[in-house]
Amino acid sequence: MDFIDLAAQQRRISEKLSANISKVLAHGQYINGPEVRELEEALAAYVGAKHAVGCASGTDALLMALMALEIGPGDAVFTTPFTFIATAEVISLLGATPVFVDIDPVTFNLDPAQLELAIAAVKKSDPAIYPLPKSAAAWNGNRLAAVGIVLVEDHDGCTNPDPDDRRNDDAQAGGEIGLRPRAVIPVDLFGLPADYDAIGAVAARHGLDVVEDAAQSFGGECRGKKAGAFGRIACTSFFPAKPLGCYGDAGMCFTDDDRLAAALRSIRVHGQGSDKYDNVRIGINGRLDTLQAAILLAKFSIFPEEIDLRQEVAKRYDALLAGIIKTPVIPDGYKSAWAQYSLLARDDAERNALMAKLRDGGVPTAIYYPKPLHRQAAFAGLRYDGETANQACSATASRNTSPGSPDPSLPPFFPISEDCARRIFSLPMHPYLEASAQQKIAALLECRAPFLPFSRAKR
Protein backbone atom coordinates (compact mmCIF):
# COMPACT_ATOMS: atom_id res chain seq x y z
CA MET A 1 0.00 0.00 0.00
CA ASP A 2 1.30 3.47 -0.90
CA PHE A 3 1.00 6.50 1.37
CA ILE A 4 0.69 8.61 -1.81
CA ASP A 5 0.24 6.83 -5.16
CA LEU A 6 1.87 8.98 -7.84
CA ALA A 7 2.22 5.98 -10.18
CA ALA A 8 -1.55 5.56 -10.53
CA GLN A 9 -1.86 9.22 -11.50
CA GLN A 10 1.00 8.93 -13.96
CA ARG A 11 -0.66 6.01 -15.72
CA ARG A 12 -3.75 8.14 -16.33
CA ILE A 13 -1.91 11.03 -17.98
CA SER A 14 1.22 9.37 -19.38
CA GLU A 15 0.46 10.38 -22.97
CA LYS A 16 -0.21 14.00 -22.04
CA LEU A 17 2.91 14.10 -19.88
CA SER A 18 5.04 12.74 -22.71
CA ALA A 19 3.54 15.18 -25.21
CA ASN A 20 4.05 18.19 -22.94
CA ILE A 21 7.64 17.26 -22.10
CA SER A 22 8.44 16.56 -25.76
CA LYS A 23 7.08 19.98 -26.69
CA VAL A 24 9.47 21.68 -24.27
CA LEU A 25 12.39 19.62 -25.54
CA ALA A 26 11.48 20.67 -29.07
CA HIS A 27 11.31 24.44 -28.47
CA GLY A 28 14.19 24.42 -25.97
CA GLN A 29 12.97 27.34 -23.82
CA TYR A 30 13.80 25.73 -20.50
CA ILE A 31 13.69 29.02 -18.59
CA ASN A 32 10.58 31.22 -18.85
CA GLY A 33 9.14 29.12 -21.67
CA PRO A 34 5.54 29.59 -22.85
CA GLU A 35 4.29 26.82 -20.55
CA VAL A 36 5.12 28.94 -17.51
CA ARG A 37 2.81 31.74 -18.60
CA GLU A 38 0.15 29.23 -19.68
CA LEU A 39 0.21 27.63 -16.24
CA GLU A 40 0.10 30.99 -14.47
CA GLU A 41 -2.95 32.03 -16.46
CA ALA A 42 -4.72 28.71 -15.90
CA LEU A 43 -4.15 28.67 -12.15
CA ALA A 44 -4.99 32.35 -11.70
CA ALA A 45 -8.33 31.67 -13.39
CA TYR A 46 -8.91 28.58 -11.24
CA VAL A 47 -8.19 30.43 -8.00
CA GLY A 48 -9.93 33.63 -9.07
CA ALA A 49 -6.84 35.80 -8.61
CA LYS A 50 -5.76 38.62 -10.92
CA HIS A 51 -2.11 37.54 -10.96
CA ALA A 52 -0.21 34.27 -10.57
CA VAL A 53 3.58 34.29 -10.37
CA GLY A 54 5.33 30.93 -10.70
CA CYS A 55 8.49 30.24 -8.74
CA ALA A 56 10.94 27.50 -7.84
CA SER A 57 9.29 26.15 -4.66
CA GLY A 58 6.67 26.79 -2.04
CA THR A 59 9.40 28.09 0.25
CA ASP A 60 10.50 30.58 -2.41
CA ALA A 61 6.87 31.64 -2.80
CA LEU A 62 6.67 32.53 0.89
CA LEU A 63 10.07 34.23 0.82
CA MET A 64 9.17 36.28 -2.25
CA ALA A 65 5.85 37.30 -0.69
CA LEU A 66 7.54 38.68 2.43
CA MET A 67 10.21 40.39 0.32
CA ALA A 68 7.51 42.05 -1.81
CA LEU A 69 5.86 43.29 1.40
CA GLU A 70 9.27 44.61 2.56
CA ILE A 71 9.30 42.55 5.75
CA GLY A 72 12.59 42.87 7.60
CA PRO A 73 14.40 43.43 10.91
CA GLY A 74 12.19 44.78 13.69
CA ASP A 75 9.06 43.24 12.17
CA ALA A 76 6.94 40.66 13.96
CA VAL A 77 5.31 38.10 11.69
CA PHE A 78 2.74 35.88 13.38
CA THR A 79 2.33 32.24 12.42
CA THR A 80 1.61 28.83 13.88
CA PRO A 81 4.24 26.61 15.53
CA PHE A 82 2.38 23.52 14.29
CA THR A 83 3.55 23.38 10.69
CA PHE A 84 6.53 22.67 8.45
CA ILE A 85 9.58 24.81 9.19
CA ALA A 86 9.50 26.74 5.88
CA THR A 87 6.75 29.08 7.10
CA ALA A 88 8.79 30.44 9.99
CA GLU A 89 12.13 29.90 8.24
CA VAL A 90 11.46 32.55 5.59
CA ILE A 91 10.54 35.07 8.29
CA SER A 92 13.88 34.48 9.96
CA LEU A 93 15.86 34.60 6.71
CA LEU A 94 14.74 38.21 6.26
CA GLY A 95 15.77 39.17 9.78
CA ALA A 96 12.18 39.48 10.99
CA THR A 97 10.97 37.64 14.09
CA PRO A 98 8.46 34.79 14.01
CA VAL A 99 5.90 35.16 16.78
CA PHE A 100 4.06 31.90 17.27
CA VAL A 101 0.32 31.66 17.81
CA ASP A 102 -1.42 28.50 19.00
CA ILE A 103 -3.89 26.55 16.91
CA ASP A 104 -7.56 25.69 17.12
CA PRO A 105 -7.94 22.12 18.48
CA VAL A 106 -10.63 21.22 15.97
CA THR A 107 -9.17 22.51 12.69
CA PHE A 108 -5.44 22.56 13.65
CA ASN A 109 -5.25 26.00 12.01
CA LEU A 110 -4.16 29.29 13.58
CA ASP A 111 -6.64 30.43 16.25
CA PRO A 112 -7.89 34.00 15.57
CA ALA A 113 -8.58 34.62 19.27
CA GLN A 114 -5.00 33.67 20.16
CA LEU A 115 -3.76 35.92 17.34
CA GLU A 116 -5.52 38.89 18.94
CA LEU A 117 -3.76 38.18 22.23
CA ALA A 118 -0.37 37.73 20.57
CA ILE A 119 -0.65 41.07 18.77
CA ALA A 120 -1.60 42.81 22.01
CA ALA A 121 1.37 41.20 23.76
CA VAL A 122 3.80 42.41 21.09
CA LYS A 123 2.39 45.93 21.10
CA LYS A 124 2.71 46.17 24.89
CA SER A 125 5.85 44.05 25.09
CA ASP A 126 4.05 42.01 27.73
CA PRO A 127 4.51 38.22 27.74
CA ALA A 128 1.97 38.03 30.55
CA ILE A 129 -0.66 38.64 27.86
CA TYR A 130 0.72 35.97 25.51
CA PRO A 131 4.03 34.08 25.18
CA LEU A 132 6.64 36.13 23.33
CA PRO A 133 10.13 35.42 22.01
CA LYS A 134 13.13 37.12 23.52
CA SER A 135 14.23 40.56 22.27
CA ALA A 136 14.18 41.16 18.54
CA ALA A 137 17.67 42.67 18.56
CA ALA A 138 19.30 39.48 19.80
CA TRP A 139 17.25 37.25 17.50
CA ASN A 140 17.93 39.42 14.45
CA GLY A 141 21.62 39.58 15.24
CA ASN A 142 21.90 35.81 15.53
CA ARG A 143 19.94 35.09 12.37
CA LEU A 144 21.45 37.80 10.16
CA ALA A 145 24.99 36.98 11.23
CA ALA A 146 24.38 33.47 9.97
CA VAL A 147 23.85 34.84 6.46
CA GLY A 148 26.65 37.39 6.63
CA ILE A 149 24.70 40.55 7.54
CA VAL A 150 26.08 42.64 10.39
CA LEU A 151 23.67 44.79 12.35
CA VAL A 152 24.67 48.38 13.02
CA GLU A 153 23.54 50.57 15.87
CA ASP A 154 21.96 53.96 15.29
CA HIS A 155 22.03 56.97 17.60
CA ASP A 156 18.98 55.70 19.49
CA GLY A 157 20.58 52.33 20.15
CA CYS A 158 18.28 50.52 17.70
CA THR A 159 19.84 47.71 15.69
CA ASN A 160 19.14 47.51 11.97
CA PRO A 161 21.03 46.75 8.76
CA ASP A 162 20.39 50.32 7.62
CA PRO A 163 20.55 53.15 10.18
CA ASP A 164 18.32 55.23 7.92
CA ASP A 165 15.66 52.51 7.64
CA ARG A 166 12.22 53.99 8.15
CA ARG A 167 11.33 51.01 10.34
CA ASN A 168 13.51 52.22 13.23
CA ASP A 169 10.89 54.50 14.77
CA ASP A 170 7.91 52.28 14.01
CA ALA A 171 9.58 49.19 15.46
CA GLN A 172 9.62 50.81 18.88
CA ALA A 173 5.84 50.50 19.01
CA GLY A 174 6.59 47.03 20.36
CA GLY A 175 8.24 48.43 23.47
CA GLU A 176 11.31 46.76 24.96
CA ILE A 177 10.99 43.69 22.79
CA GLY A 178 11.53 46.01 19.81
CA LEU A 179 8.98 44.47 17.45
CA ARG A 180 6.41 46.05 15.18
CA PRO A 181 3.45 43.82 14.18
CA ARG A 182 3.57 43.61 10.39
CA ALA A 183 2.02 40.42 9.01
CA VAL A 184 0.38 37.10 9.77
CA ILE A 185 0.89 33.86 7.85
CA PRO A 186 -1.98 31.46 8.54
CA VAL A 187 -1.23 27.91 7.38
CA ASP A 188 -3.98 25.88 5.70
CA LEU A 189 -2.95 22.70 7.48
CA PHE A 190 -3.64 19.30 5.92
CA GLY A 191 -5.62 20.95 3.10
CA LEU A 192 -8.20 22.90 5.14
CA PRO A 193 -8.21 26.69 4.66
CA ALA A 194 -7.83 28.72 7.83
CA ASP A 195 -10.60 30.99 9.16
CA TYR A 196 -9.74 33.95 6.94
CA ASP A 197 -12.86 35.92 7.83
CA ALA A 198 -11.88 36.06 11.50
CA ILE A 199 -8.13 36.30 10.88
CA GLY A 200 -8.66 39.01 8.28
CA ALA A 201 -10.78 41.02 10.71
CA VAL A 202 -8.08 40.84 13.39
CA ALA A 203 -5.38 41.75 10.88
CA ALA A 204 -7.38 44.71 9.58
CA ARG A 205 -7.88 46.09 13.09
CA HIS A 206 -4.14 46.08 13.68
CA GLY A 207 -2.88 46.99 10.20
CA LEU A 208 -1.30 43.61 9.45
CA ASP A 209 -0.84 42.07 6.02
CA VAL A 210 -2.20 38.55 5.59
CA VAL A 211 -0.10 36.07 3.61
CA GLU A 212 -1.88 32.78 2.97
CA ASP A 213 0.26 29.65 3.23
CA ALA A 214 -1.75 27.41 0.90
CA ALA A 215 1.06 24.90 0.38
CA GLN A 216 -1.24 22.06 1.44
CA SER A 217 -4.64 23.47 0.52
CA PHE A 218 -4.58 24.14 -3.23
CA GLY A 219 -7.96 22.85 -4.40
CA GLY A 220 -9.65 23.57 -1.07
CA GLU A 221 -12.33 26.19 -0.49
CA CYS A 222 -13.71 28.50 2.19
CA ARG A 223 -17.27 29.75 1.71
CA GLY A 224 -17.07 29.36 -2.06
CA LYS A 225 -13.66 31.02 -2.37
CA LYS A 226 -10.69 28.95 -3.49
CA ALA A 227 -7.59 28.45 -1.39
CA GLY A 228 -4.94 30.72 -2.88
CA ALA A 229 -7.31 33.67 -3.03
CA PHE A 230 -6.93 34.93 0.55
CA GLY A 231 -4.74 37.71 1.91
CA ARG A 232 -2.66 40.28 0.04
CA ILE A 233 -0.52 37.44 -1.30
CA ALA A 234 -1.20 33.71 -1.23
CA CYS A 235 1.49 31.08 -1.69
CA THR A 236 1.33 27.43 -2.68
CA SER A 237 3.70 24.54 -3.28
CA PHE A 238 3.87 21.98 -6.07
CA PHE A 239 6.13 19.56 -4.20
CA PRO A 240 5.35 16.06 -5.57
CA ALA A 241 3.32 15.01 -2.50
CA LYS A 242 1.00 18.03 -2.65
CA PRO A 243 -2.55 17.78 -4.09
CA LEU A 244 -1.22 19.38 -7.29
CA GLY A 245 2.41 18.33 -7.44
CA CYS A 246 5.12 18.32 -10.08
CA TYR A 247 8.13 16.01 -10.47
CA GLY A 248 10.53 18.18 -8.51
CA ASP A 249 10.12 21.53 -6.76
CA ALA A 250 7.89 24.41 -7.82
CA GLY A 251 5.57 26.98 -6.27
CA MET A 252 3.35 29.95 -7.04
CA CYS A 253 2.20 33.28 -5.58
CA PHE A 254 -1.26 34.74 -6.16
CA THR A 255 -2.32 38.36 -5.70
CA ASP A 256 -4.83 40.92 -6.93
CA ASP A 257 -2.37 43.77 -6.37
CA ASP A 258 -0.65 44.98 -9.57
CA ARG A 259 2.28 46.52 -7.70
CA LEU A 260 2.92 43.41 -5.64
CA ALA A 261 2.68 41.21 -8.73
CA ALA A 262 5.32 43.33 -10.47
CA ALA A 263 7.56 43.12 -7.40
CA LEU A 264 7.15 39.33 -7.23
CA ARG A 265 8.09 38.93 -10.90
CA SER A 266 11.16 41.08 -10.33
CA ILE A 267 12.22 39.34 -7.12
CA ARG A 268 12.11 35.87 -8.68
CA VAL A 269 14.76 36.94 -11.24
CA HIS A 270 17.39 38.56 -9.00
CA GLY A 271 15.41 41.80 -8.67
CA GLN A 272 15.41 42.37 -12.41
CA GLY A 273 14.08 45.63 -13.81
CA SER A 274 12.92 46.42 -17.34
CA ASP A 275 16.26 45.29 -18.77
CA LYS A 276 17.89 41.90 -18.20
CA TYR A 277 20.89 43.45 -16.48
CA ASP A 278 19.01 46.27 -14.76
CA ASN A 279 18.54 45.13 -11.16
CA VAL A 280 16.25 47.43 -9.21
CA ARG A 281 16.03 45.47 -5.93
CA ILE A 282 17.59 42.55 -4.14
CA GLY A 283 15.99 39.34 -5.36
CA ILE A 284 16.58 35.62 -5.64
CA ASN A 285 16.95 32.96 -8.32
CA GLY A 286 13.39 31.71 -7.90
CA ARG A 287 12.12 30.96 -11.39
CA LEU A 288 9.72 28.14 -12.21
CA ASP A 289 11.31 25.68 -14.67
CA THR A 290 9.47 25.28 -17.97
CA LEU A 291 9.60 21.47 -17.71
CA GLN A 292 7.87 21.53 -14.33
CA ALA A 293 5.25 23.93 -15.70
CA ALA A 294 4.59 21.52 -18.57
CA ILE A 295 4.19 18.63 -16.11
CA LEU A 296 1.83 20.69 -13.96
CA LEU A 297 -0.30 21.56 -17.00
CA ALA A 298 -0.74 17.85 -17.68
CA LYS A 299 -1.64 17.17 -14.06
CA PHE A 300 -3.97 20.15 -13.83
CA SER A 301 -6.09 18.67 -16.63
CA ILE A 302 -7.39 16.07 -14.15
CA PHE A 303 -6.93 18.07 -10.94
CA PRO A 304 -10.59 19.04 -10.33
CA GLU A 305 -11.58 15.39 -10.71
CA GLU A 306 -8.83 14.34 -8.32
CA ILE A 307 -10.05 16.82 -5.71
CA ASP A 308 -13.51 15.23 -5.99
CA LEU A 309 -11.96 11.78 -5.58
CA ARG A 310 -10.15 12.97 -2.46
CA GLN A 311 -13.54 13.99 -1.01
CA GLU A 312 -14.83 10.46 -1.61
CA VAL A 313 -11.79 8.89 0.03
CA ALA A 314 -12.17 11.18 3.06
CA LYS A 315 -15.88 10.39 3.38
CA ARG A 316 -15.14 6.65 3.37
CA TYR A 317 -12.57 7.14 6.11
CA ASP A 318 -15.06 9.20 8.12
CA ALA A 319 -17.69 6.47 7.89
CA LEU A 320 -15.31 3.59 8.59
CA LEU A 321 -13.59 5.23 11.56
CA ALA A 322 -16.58 6.92 13.22
CA GLY A 323 -16.57 6.09 16.93
CA ILE A 324 -13.17 4.41 16.69
CA ILE A 325 -10.78 7.36 16.74
CA LYS A 326 -10.86 11.16 16.45
CA THR A 327 -11.25 11.97 12.75
CA PRO A 328 -10.83 15.37 11.02
CA VAL A 329 -13.57 17.98 11.29
CA ILE A 330 -14.43 20.15 8.28
CA PRO A 331 -16.49 23.21 9.32
CA ASP A 332 -19.62 24.13 7.39
CA GLY A 333 -18.80 26.11 4.26
CA TYR A 334 -15.30 24.65 3.97
CA LYS A 335 -13.81 22.11 1.59
CA SER A 336 -10.47 20.46 2.29
CA ALA A 337 -8.01 19.52 -0.43
CA TRP A 338 -7.12 16.55 1.80
CA ALA A 339 -3.37 16.78 1.48
CA GLN A 340 -3.37 14.54 4.56
CA TYR A 341 -5.97 12.60 6.51
CA SER A 342 -4.86 13.01 10.12
CA LEU A 343 -6.11 11.32 13.29
CA LEU A 344 -5.68 12.04 17.00
CA ALA A 345 -4.75 9.22 19.36
CA ARG A 346 -5.24 9.59 23.12
CA ASP A 347 -1.52 10.12 23.72
CA ASP A 348 1.87 9.41 22.20
CA ALA A 349 2.00 5.87 23.61
CA GLU A 350 -1.25 4.93 21.92
CA ARG A 351 -0.15 6.67 18.72
CA ASN A 352 3.06 4.66 18.64
CA ALA A 353 1.16 1.43 19.25
CA LEU A 354 -1.38 2.16 16.52
CA MET A 355 1.29 3.15 14.01
CA ALA A 356 3.21 -0.04 14.80
CA LYS A 357 0.09 -2.12 14.31
CA LEU A 358 -0.63 -0.46 10.97
CA ARG A 359 2.99 -0.87 9.90
CA ASP A 360 2.89 -4.58 10.74
CA GLY A 361 -0.26 -4.82 8.64
CA GLY A 362 1.47 -3.24 5.65
CA VAL A 363 -0.06 0.22 6.07
CA PRO A 364 2.31 3.24 5.90
CA THR A 365 1.70 6.19 8.22
CA ALA A 366 3.38 9.53 8.93
CA ILE A 367 3.44 12.20 11.65
CA TYR A 368 2.83 15.82 10.68
CA TYR A 369 4.33 17.26 12.93
CA PRO A 370 6.12 15.56 15.85
CA LYS A 371 7.75 18.67 17.33
CA PRO A 372 6.33 22.24 17.27
CA LEU A 373 8.62 24.87 15.80
CA HIS A 374 9.27 26.69 19.08
CA ARG A 375 10.89 23.48 20.35
CA GLN A 376 13.16 23.13 17.31
CA ALA A 377 16.89 23.76 17.60
CA ALA A 378 16.68 26.19 14.66
CA PHE A 379 14.55 28.53 16.80
CA ALA A 380 16.45 28.09 20.06
CA GLY A 381 17.27 31.81 19.99
CA LEU A 382 13.62 32.69 20.49
CA ARG A 383 13.82 31.08 23.95
CA TYR A 384 10.10 30.48 24.38
CA ASP A 385 10.69 27.75 26.94
CA GLY A 386 13.53 29.29 28.92
CA GLU A 387 15.87 26.60 27.66
CA THR A 388 17.51 26.20 24.31
CA ALA A 389 15.92 23.66 22.01
CA ASN A 390 19.09 21.57 22.25
CA GLN A 391 18.78 21.42 26.02
CA ALA A 392 15.15 20.45 25.65
CA CYS A 393 16.08 17.68 23.22
CA SER A 394 18.69 16.34 25.64
CA ALA A 395 16.22 16.41 28.49
CA THR A 396 13.67 14.59 26.36
CA ALA A 397 16.14 11.88 25.42
CA SER A 398 17.23 11.37 29.03
CA ARG A 399 13.64 10.82 30.11
CA ASN A 400 13.05 8.24 27.36
CA THR A 401 10.00 9.99 25.99
CA SER A 402 8.93 9.42 22.40
CA PRO A 403 11.65 10.46 19.92
CA GLY A 404 11.02 13.94 18.58
CA SER A 405 8.07 14.63 20.89
CA PRO A 406 7.98 17.80 23.00
CA ASP A 407 9.28 17.42 26.55
CA PRO A 408 6.19 17.30 28.80
CA SER A 409 8.18 18.76 31.71
CA LEU A 410 8.69 22.08 29.93
CA PRO A 411 6.06 24.87 30.06
CA PRO A 412 3.34 24.30 27.44
CA PHE A 413 3.30 27.82 26.03
CA PHE A 414 1.31 26.56 23.05
CA PRO A 415 -0.65 23.72 24.69
CA ILE A 416 -2.84 22.79 21.74
CA SER A 417 0.09 22.56 19.35
CA GLU A 418 2.11 20.52 21.83
CA ASP A 419 -0.79 18.20 22.61
CA CYS A 420 -1.45 17.59 18.91
CA ALA A 421 2.24 16.96 18.26
CA ARG A 422 2.13 14.11 20.78
CA ARG A 423 -1.06 12.55 19.42
CA ILE A 424 -1.42 13.16 15.70
CA PHE A 425 -0.66 10.76 12.84
CA SER A 426 -1.75 10.49 9.22
CA LEU A 427 -3.12 7.66 7.09
CA PRO A 428 -2.60 7.04 3.37
CA MET A 429 -4.46 9.68 1.34
CA HIS A 430 -4.59 10.07 -2.43
CA PRO A 431 -7.30 10.09 -5.14
CA TYR A 432 -6.69 6.45 -6.09
CA LEU A 433 -6.98 4.85 -2.65
CA GLU A 434 -9.40 1.94 -2.99
CA ALA A 435 -12.23 1.18 -0.58
CA SER A 436 -10.77 -2.25 0.17
CA ALA A 437 -7.53 -0.66 1.38
CA GLN A 438 -9.47 1.70 3.64
CA GLN A 439 -11.49 -1.20 5.05
CA LYS A 440 -8.24 -2.96 5.92
CA ILE A 441 -7.00 0.16 7.72
CA ALA A 442 -10.24 0.48 9.68
CA ALA A 443 -10.10 -3.19 10.69
CA LEU A 444 -6.62 -2.70 12.10
CA LEU A 445 -7.76 0.32 14.13
CA GLU A 446 -11.21 -0.76 15.32
CA CYS A 447 -10.05 -3.16 18.05
CA ARG A 448 -8.98 -0.20 20.21
CA ALA A 449 -11.20 1.15 22.99
CA PRO A 450 -13.78 3.84 22.09
CA PHE A 451 -12.44 7.31 21.48
CA LEU A 452 -12.16 9.68 24.43
CA PRO A 453 -13.21 13.24 23.46
CA PHE A 454 -10.49 15.89 23.17
CA SER A 455 -10.96 18.96 25.35
CA ARG A 456 -9.17 22.28 24.93
CA ALA A 457 -6.18 22.52 27.21
CA LYS A 458 -6.20 25.51 29.55
CA ARG A 459 -3.56 28.18 29.10
Language-model-detected regions and their locations in the chain:
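Conserved PLP-binding active-site segment in aminotransferase class I/II-type PLP enzymes
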Residues: 1-68, 72, 93, 156, ...
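Conserved coil-to-alpha-helix start sites within the AMP-binding
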Residues: 83-88
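PLP-dependent aminotransferase class I/II
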Residues: 36-41, 50, 113, 133, ...
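Phosphate-binding glycine-rich loop
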Residues: 29-76, 90-94, 99-102, 124-154, ...
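Active-site phosphate-binding strand-loop segment of PLP-dependent enzymes
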Residues: 106-246, 252-254
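Hydrophobic "anchor" residues on beta-strands that sit immediately upstream
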Residues: 1, 75-76, 208-209
